[in-house]
């Protein structure tokens, strides 16, 4: 048993070894005499063999060596959440109860939580007792156990209460790590890497080399630590030595010890937000990279050191970004609580700060800190490194001259790595670009055993020992991110790879964009030469599966090279390893980027293989067989594409910039940029063989370049484009850059789009772009509210626009700044430190919602049986989305010149299906965006069509399956003689197609049978609401106030369909217990949802409760449960209940496919086994938060009143997500009353096994216990004696059991209203009528958008700090239309008659409903002119002054009459109205032209009679507007949804 002793503070008290339990026991008993030894651990550790051995050995030895002493043990709950005052007090109480005294020795056996907390117990118990640290995690061994820091956490931060209390011993028994889960093991490596990074470069290098072996062992199913025992002990030992040495120099953290906090300033702040989901080491790992980037940003740390640190951390499986994919899986939605302001506040109260000044440890190089102390850093600089969005401030005073050395060329770097890996011997590669691209290349080369790779000169030099082309397969996919160069080069390299036991093939893959970029021509060429290559996803793009062991045949290879020269270079570099010499012929026209091909040939020559160009055949190359011989050293030239940015900066700002290592002799085509582009634009250019200097003209005096062919330097066109943007006086045309459409993004399109945000017009050319330059003074600042400048995950887009941004008058937001890491990770640092540009971090507002569908994004395909309403509902759908509608059957008929019935009669169903599939393929491609495609019922019969439908849905399109009751369908089809007869019964056809409809669709709507106009209108409204949800146009908002959900617990809702409206009175949602239905087939469940929607216009909570969670659905039927939950999403329910007890795979799948449906994560303790102070409830809540539930629902069972009070405490402590939490049982009713969000309620007509309360019972009880206070509401104005508002509101209060009263208060003076009503303690709110709608506004401290635009207030309610004014008249108008069957959005035209206050509300309502033009008619035109001036121009208002104008009015479908109904219509007004009504008399857009009367007396007005009887318009009486505005007013006043039918009857039934 070898034991290493490390001195600290003058004593050798740190002992490190493997399997040293005996040594620990002997050392403690022999040297720390005590009457009482106490071992404290947590419940997890207590179950391990190592702990059992330690305690057993202790007992045995103690009885022999100190029989008078005793051993006590104590276990605490595990986890950071328990490192608190409560747990500390519990340990202290135990010690006191056991009679422990000042001679007690405590052994803290566990991870950092135990070490910190029990160390603090020892520091304070009896004013300090001895403690021995026995760390059992890697993190604790190398960090928290050494140095005497002890502490507990508080709600405000970690480790804020504690003491320095040095342990008597620290025993690091590495064998304890055998029990450590892989994640915890990896977690500890962060601190190990940290100590090496700040102090010991030699150890850091060892760690770089140890990473692969370490990770393979600790992540294996049965880790064998014995195989890495020596390295593991050394890892712990070296890290402990660094920390012990620093602590010995600075025990109380006065200066030097601060260095141990490298990565912790930012890391601790992140951890404070993300704990417990994120571990300490994971957060510190991210913190180290961010603080290293800060050092680089400040010009202290070389970029290569950041890259090296990042690579090392990644090699140990640690995250280096908050947005690391695996890290995000662990922290879930908590990621979105990591906000800059929160992090800065956390950092400001860090213990190592000087007051509130934030201090960071800055790295100078690997193994050394800058000035051996922590430094004060600005919040602005921290904000910059903490976010991926940047605000570029105006270039106010840049240096007149600058010398910039860009990083190594990406093109040359990638080629050099391929050549070196294929070559024999060792080469030292200098000035290699350290970027994402080259990292992927290095990783791939190493994985394929192409070379042994190491570093020298602190990472500046890459040492490659090539294996002469002897590559072999590896077991894992080679992930290449968005590295196009790496993917193309490695595709040919992979064809040379031999087989190994690990695999028979090589798989190359990348990110989403990489899987769109073309690689087909290269694959075709390689296949023709014997390579076996398979596309695993999309034809022509990655991922690729390349069979090993085939090699290249050689001989003649033909390659299309008009898209990418990288295809050519890929084959050129690998050609010497073919079985025969290669002749590479480039076909299809002039190759793109010839200079890059020349570069490849020149580099191959440097590595010993000379390519000869054919003298007889154009664009043809001869490559001999051979093996590259690596030169001793190869220096990478700086990147000429990157050099264009600092040179362009000089051109645009009138300054001078020199690139000292790129000149006319460069291998790179982009080296010509200064001479060929900037010089003709008015710059002074001085270029030697090895350097380039550009001096720009005075700012604003650049000249446009009528035409430039940039084919030799295509990547530089983006730089040229932003320069051309401020070259006034003409246009600049850039051609020869067609290949830029298939780079990281479509760069030409991106440039046109983003330039427009600066006010610069540009247009695409067949192979280029034309930019119409403007005066620099006319540049616009892109709107931050419109997300600023998009980078498209493209480094060159980001860098180019960073130049143009600085010429704007205000700061410009650029997204995804880190994308520059592809070629110039330090670009922003150069802007900041060299060009002295002010940069700021920016954090966009977070939006968790999926992207809302727009016409420019996707389309909708509608499928379903014949007779299900596809045509009608498709029209509604197109109208709502603003799409075009295409009936594919009609399209087919037009294309073939015959109707379908005749076609089938003549040629049969089989021929028709073939033609249908051809048309489907054409339509799905040609009309994939901005269209609703209504298909024939049998579209799913063909395999090709089915695959196309599935692909469309998989790629984000909506395939909507419409269905209705089969019996109704049969009846409908029997009466329709226009369609071809089925060759079999409808039932048989349905049974055959049913599974196909489900397979091919991602959404499902059950269309109820309609027998009345009201039912038809309700179907339309339900369908539009459904479309709103599945497209994201309108998503259910989680209530913030008190809300309820009525729980439907019936086997068949059709039994109570007529009562559903009464059952749902007062509820904010309806919860359908799917598990309690008599049939859970998809058809029956869909029909039940349709019934719910037909009778209750409320969000649906879709719940399938399993037996173990108090329901009826079998727990073991996991696949059926998944199908039912996915069906709920397809049915477009607002909320889906997802049990926290479900398998993780199920939770992940539902979460990933939820679309716009919200998730309620639920756990029920049906037996009441858990008290609310049990940590398990906290764990369940955290699980709900982690799985990204929108709401967490926790249900217990109360046995006493205290259970309800404990629940209230729990709710106060857990506020990250909305929480539904209550107890069942008689004793739990109080908790149901106190619950805030979606309290489940029952009804007298429903089974109620859970003892739920009704809405009336809840409201009454809540009032009785003081939750509600009695309030008074009033209608004010004059005259109001006939106002129906009191009837409406009081009827609603009574129905919901609310303690409110609504009365009338006649007044013409608002001050009187204030004194008598508003200023009273029981004031609840006002309904305001004339003449007070304007005067009342002086009391409103805040106005709604509607009230501001309309310019009047009809509703006033008290809010914190004042009063909120709203106008619900417009809602009364719009909802009256909608309830009458008018779609909520339609691009029709509207008419408003009148010019008073209600007219303003009518205009606002019609605009909100999507009217493209609103015509105005009134007796006095001057009043209309004033009205038009008060509305924004986009309302598109037009005054109709004459009858002639009325004749020319475009078809009007919506009209609102806002003129007094008790007086005869003015004859001139009447004539104009009649002409307009006559023009809109026919039904279009799926609804009948409709007129709303704003006056509710008399019931039928003259204009209503005219419209209905003479012009056949649908009319809506004014009483409907009154009810609908009151419905919204009721919600504003009380927070409750009004019982609509009840308030309607109260108003209508006088």
Swiss-Prot record:
Residues 1-379 are annotated as: 3-dehydroquinate synthase. 7-phospho-2-dehydro-3-deoxy-D-arabino-heptonate binds at residues 127, 143, 149, 159, 191-194, 243, 257-261, 264, 280, 351. Binds 2 Zn(2+) ions per subunit. It is found in: Cytoplasm. NAD(+) binds at residues 42-44, 80-83, 111-113, 116, 136-137, 158, 176-179, 187. It catalyses: 7-phospho-2-dehydro-3-deoxy-D-arabino-heptonate = 3-dehydroquinate + phosphate; 3-dehydroquinate = 3-dehydroshikimate + H2O; shikimate + NADP(+) = 3-dehydroshikimate + NADPH + H(+); shikimate + ATP = 3-phosphoshikimate + ADP + H(+). Residues 1048-1257 are annotated as: 3-dehydroquinase. Its cofactor is Zn(2+). Its EC number is 4.2.3.4, 2.5.1.19, 2.7.1.71, 4.2.1.10. SUPFAM superfamilies: Aldolase (SSF51569), Aminoacid dehydrogenase-like, N-terminal domain (SSF53223), Dehydroquinate synthase-like (SSF56796), EPT/RTPC-like (SSF55205), NAD(P)-binding Rossmann-fold domains (SSF51735), P-loop containing nucleoside triphosphate hydrolases (SSF52540). Pathway: Metabolic intermediate biosynthesis; chorismate biosynthesis; chorismate from D-erythrose 4-phosphate and phosphoenolpyruvate: step 2/7; Metabolic intermediate biosynthesis; chorismate biosynthesis; chorismate from D-erythrose 4-phosphate and phosphoenolpyruvate: step 3/7; Metabolic intermediate biosynthesis; chorismate biosynthesis; chorismate from D-erythrose 4-phosphate and phosphoenolpyruvate: step 4/7; Metabolic intermediate biosynthesis; chorismate biosynthesis; chorismate from D-erythrose 4-phosphate and phosphoenolpyruvate: step 5/7. Residues 1270-1550 are annotated as: Shikimate dehydrogenase. GO terms for biological process: amino acid biosynthetic process; aromatic amino acid family biosynthetic process; chorismate biosynthetic process. One of its GO terms (cellular component) is cytoplasm. One of its GO terms (molecular function) is ATP binding. The active site is at 253 (proton acceptor), 268 (proton acceptor), 1193 (schiff-base intermediate with substrate). InterPro entries: Aldolase_TIM (IPR013785), Aminoacid_DH-like_N_sf (IPR046346), DHQ_synth_AroB (IPR016037), DHQS/DOIS_N (IPR030960), DHQS_C (IPR056179), DHquinase_I (IPR001381), Enolpyruvate_Tfrase_dom (IPR001986), Enolpyruvate_Tfrase_sf (IPR036968). Zn(2+) binds at residues 191, 264, 280. Residues 392-837 are annotated as: EPSP synthase. Residues 857-1047 are annotated as: Shikimate kinase. ATP binds at residues 864-871. HAMAP family: EPSP_synth (MF_00210), Pentafunct_AroM (MF_03143), Shikimate_kinase (MF_00109). Homodimer. The AROM polypeptide catalyzes 5 consecutive enzymatic reactions in prechorismate polyaromatic amino acid biosynthesis. In the N-terminal section; belongs to the sugar phosphate cyclases superfamily. Dehydroquinate synthase family. In the 2nd section; belongs to the EPSP synthase family. This is Pentafunctional AROM polypeptide. It comes from Candida dubliniensis (strain CD36 / ATCC MYA-646 / CBS 7987 / NCPF 3949 / NRRL Y-17841) (Yeast). The gene is ARO1.
């Amino acid at each position: 048993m070898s034991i290493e002793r490390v001195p600290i503070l003058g004593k050798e008290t740190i002992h490190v070894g493997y399997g040293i339990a005996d040594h620990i026991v002997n050392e403690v008993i022999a040297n720390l005499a005590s009457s009482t030894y106490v071992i404290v651990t947590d419940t997890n550790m207590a179950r391990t063999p190592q702990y059992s051995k330690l305690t057993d050995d202790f007992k045995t030895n103690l009885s022999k060596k100190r029989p008078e002493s005793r051993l006590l043990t104590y276990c605490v709950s595990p986890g950071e959440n328990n490192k608190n005052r409560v747990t500390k007090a519990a340990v202290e109480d135990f010690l006191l109860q056991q009679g422990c005294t000042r001679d007690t020795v405590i052994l803290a056996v566990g991870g950092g939580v135990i070490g910190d907390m029990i160390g603090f117990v020892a520091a304070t118990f009896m004013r300090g007792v001895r403690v021995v640290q026995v760390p059992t995690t890697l993190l604790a061994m190398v960090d928290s156990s050494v140095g005497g820091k002890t502490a507990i956490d508080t709600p405000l931060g970690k480790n804020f209460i504690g003491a320095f209390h040095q342990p008597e011993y620290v025993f690091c028994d590495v064998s304890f790590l055998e029990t450590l889960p892989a994640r915890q093991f990896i977690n500890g490596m962060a601190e190990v890497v940290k100590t090496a990074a700040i102090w010991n470069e030699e150890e850091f290098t060892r760690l770089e080399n140890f990473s692969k072996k370490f990770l393979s062992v600790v992540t294996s199913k049965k880790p064998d630590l014995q195989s890495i025992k020596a390295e593991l002990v050394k890892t712990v030992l070296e890290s402990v030595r660094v920390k012990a040495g620093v602590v010995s120099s600075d025990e109380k953290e006065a200066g030097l010890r601060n260095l141990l906090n490298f990565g912790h300033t930012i890391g601790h702040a992140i951890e404070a937000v993300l704990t417990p989901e994120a571990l300490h080491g994971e957060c510190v790992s991210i913190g180290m990279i961010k603080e290293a980037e800060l050092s680089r940003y400040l010009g202290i740390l070389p970029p290569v050191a950041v890259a090296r640190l990042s690579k090392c951390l990644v090699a140990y499986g640690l995250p280096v970004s908050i947005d690391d994919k695996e890290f995000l899986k662990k922290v879930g939605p908590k990621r979105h609580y990591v906000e800059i302001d929160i992090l800065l506040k956390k950092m400001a109260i860090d213990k190592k700060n000087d007051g509130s000044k934030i201090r960071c440890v800055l790295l100078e190089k690997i193994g050394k800190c800058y000035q051996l102390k922590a430094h004060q850093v600005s919040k602005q600089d921290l904000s910059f490194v903490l976010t991926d969005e940047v605000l570029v401030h105006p270039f106010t005073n840049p240096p007149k001259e600058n010398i910039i050395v860009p990083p190594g060329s990406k093109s040359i770097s990638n080629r050099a790595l391929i050549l070196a890996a294929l070559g024999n011997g060792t080469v030292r590669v200098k000035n290699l670009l350290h970027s994402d691209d080259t990292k992927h290349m290095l990783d791939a080369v190493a994985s394929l055993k192409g070379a042994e790779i190491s570093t020298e000169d602190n990472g500046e030099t890459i040492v490659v020992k090539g294996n002469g082309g002897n590559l072999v397969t590896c077991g894992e996919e080679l992930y290449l991110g968005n590295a196009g160069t790496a993917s193309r080069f490695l595709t040919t390299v992979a064809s040379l790879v031999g087989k190994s036991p690990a695999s028979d093939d090589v798989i190359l893959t990348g990110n989403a964009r990489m899987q769109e970029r073309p690689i087909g021509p290269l694959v075709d060429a390689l296949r023709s030469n014997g390579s076996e290559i398979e596309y695993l996803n999309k034809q022509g793009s990655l991922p690729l599966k390349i069979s090993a062991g085939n090699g290249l045949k050689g001989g003649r290879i033909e390659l299309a090279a008009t898209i990418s020269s990288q295809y050519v270079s890929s084959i050129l570099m690998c050609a010497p390893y073919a079985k025969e010499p290669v002749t590479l012929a480039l076909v299809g026209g002039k190759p793109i980027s010839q200079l890059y091909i020349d570069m490849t040939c020149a580099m191959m020559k440097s590595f010993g293989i000379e390519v000869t160009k054919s003298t007889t055949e154009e664009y043809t190359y001869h490559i001999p067989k051979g093996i590259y011989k690596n030169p001793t050293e190869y220096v990478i030239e700086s990147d000429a594409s990157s050099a264009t940015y600092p040179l362009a900066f000089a051109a645009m700002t009138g300054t001078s910039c020199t690139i000292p290592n790129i000149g006319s002799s460069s291998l790179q085509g982009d080296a010509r940029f200064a001479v060929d582009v900037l010089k003709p634009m008015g710059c002074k250019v001085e270029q030697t063989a090895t350097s380039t200097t550009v001096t720009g003209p005075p700012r604003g005096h650049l000249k446009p370049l009528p035409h430039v062919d940039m084919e030799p330097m295509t990547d530089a066109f983006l730089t040229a484009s932003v320069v051309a943007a401020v070259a006034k006086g003409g246009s600049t045309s850039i051609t020869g850059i067609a290949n830029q459409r298939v780079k990281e993004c479509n760069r030409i399109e991106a440039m046109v789009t983003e330039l427009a945000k600066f006010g610069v017009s540009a247009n695409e050319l067949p192979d280029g772009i034309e930019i119409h330059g403007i005066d620099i003074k006319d540049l616009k600042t892109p709107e931050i509210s419109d997300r600023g400048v998009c980078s498209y995950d493209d480094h060159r887009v980001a860098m180019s626009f960073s130049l143009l941004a600085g010429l704007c008058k205000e700061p410009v937001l650029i997204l995804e700044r880190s994308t520059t890491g592809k070629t110039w990770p330090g670009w922003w640092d150069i802007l900041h430190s060299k060009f002295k540009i002010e940069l700021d971090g920016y954090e966009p507002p977070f939006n968790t919602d999926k992207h809302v569908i727009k016409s420019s994004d996707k389309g909708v395909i509608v499928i379903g049986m014949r007779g299900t309403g596809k045509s009608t509902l498709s029209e509604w759908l197109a109208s709502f989305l603003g799409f075009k509608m295409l009936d594919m059957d009609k399209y087919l008929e037009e294309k073939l010149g015959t109707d379908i019935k005749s076609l089938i009669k003549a040629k049969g169903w089989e021929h028709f299906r073939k033609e249908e599939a051809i048309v489907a393929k054409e339509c799905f491609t040609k009309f994939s965006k901005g269209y609703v495609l209504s298909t024939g019922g049998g579209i799913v019969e063909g395999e090709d069509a089915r695959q196309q439908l599935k692909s469309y849905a998989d790629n984000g399109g909506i395939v909507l399956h419409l269905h209705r009751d089969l019996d109704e369908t049969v009846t409908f089809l029997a009466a329709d003689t226009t369609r071809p007869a089925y060759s079999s019964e409808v039932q048989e056809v349905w049974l055959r197609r049913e599974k196909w409809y489900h397979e091919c669709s991602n959404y499902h709507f059950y269309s109820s049978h309609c027998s009345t106009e009201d039912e038809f209108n309700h179907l339309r409204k339900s369908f539009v609401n459904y479309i709103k949800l599945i497209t994201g146009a309108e998503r259910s908002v989680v209530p913030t106030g008190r809300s309820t959900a009525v729980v439907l617990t019936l086997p068949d809702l059709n039994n109570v369909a007529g009562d559903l409206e009464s059952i749902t009175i007062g509820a904010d949602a309806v919860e359908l217990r799917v598990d309690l239905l008599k049939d859970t087939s998809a058809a029956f469940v869909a029909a039940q949802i349709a019934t719910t929607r037909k009778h209750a216009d409320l969000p649906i909570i879709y719940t399938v409760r399993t037996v173990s969670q108090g329901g009826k659905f079998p727990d073991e039927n996991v696949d059926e449960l998944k199908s039912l939950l996915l069906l709920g999403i397809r049915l477009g329910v607002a909320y889906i209940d997802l049990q926290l007890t479900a398998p993780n795979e199920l939770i992940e799948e539902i979460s990933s496919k939820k679309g716009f449906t919200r998730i309620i994560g639920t756990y029920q303790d049906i037996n009441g086994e858990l008290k609310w102070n049990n940590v398990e409830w906290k764990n369940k809540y955290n699980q709900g938060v982690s799985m990204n539930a929108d709401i967490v629902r926790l249900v217990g069972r109360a046995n006493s009143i205290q259970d309800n009070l404990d629940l209230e405490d729990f709710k106060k402590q857990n506020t990250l997500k909305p929480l539904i939490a209550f107890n069942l049982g008689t004793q739990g009713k109080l908790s149901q009353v106190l619950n805030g969000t979606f309290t489940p309620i029952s009804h007298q007509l429903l089974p109620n096994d859970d003892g739920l309360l009704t809405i009336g019972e809840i409201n009454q009880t809540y009032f009785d216990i003081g939750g509600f206070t009695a309030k008074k509401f009033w209608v004010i104005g004059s005259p109001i004696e006939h106002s129906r508002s009191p009837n409406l509101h009081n009827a609603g209060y009574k129905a919901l059991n609310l303690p409110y009263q609504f009365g009338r208060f006649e007044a013409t003076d608002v001050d009187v209203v204030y004194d008598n009503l508003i200023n009273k303690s029981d004031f609840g709110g006002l309904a305001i009528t004339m003449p007070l709608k304007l005067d009342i506004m002086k009391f409103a401290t805040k106005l709604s958008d509607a009230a501001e635009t309309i310019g009047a207030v009809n509703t006033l309610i008290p809010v914190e700090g004042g009063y909120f004014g709203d106008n619900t008249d417009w809602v009364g108008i719009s909802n009256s239309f909608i309830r009458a069957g008018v779609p909520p959005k339609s691009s029709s035209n509207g008419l408003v008659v009148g010019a008073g206050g209600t007219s303003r509300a009518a205009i606002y309502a019609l605009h909100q409903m999507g009217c493209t033009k609103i015509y105005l008619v009134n007796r006095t035109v001057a009043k209309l002119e004033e009205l038009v001036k008060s509305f924004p121009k986009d309302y598109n208002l037009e005054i109709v002054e004459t009858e002639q104008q009325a004749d020319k009015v475009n078809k009007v479908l919506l009209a609102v009459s806002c003129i007094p109904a008790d007086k005869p219509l003015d004859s001139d007004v009447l004539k104009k109205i009649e002409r307009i009504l006559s023009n809109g008399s026919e039904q279009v857009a799926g609804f009948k032209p409709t007129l709303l009367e704003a006056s509710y007396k008399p019931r039928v007005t003259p204009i209503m009679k005219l419209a209905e009887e003479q012009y056949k318009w649908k009319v809506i009486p004014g009483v409907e507007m009154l009810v609908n505005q009151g419905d919204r007013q009721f919600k504003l006043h009380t927070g409750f949804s009004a019982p609509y039918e009840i308030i309607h009857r109260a108003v209508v039934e006088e």
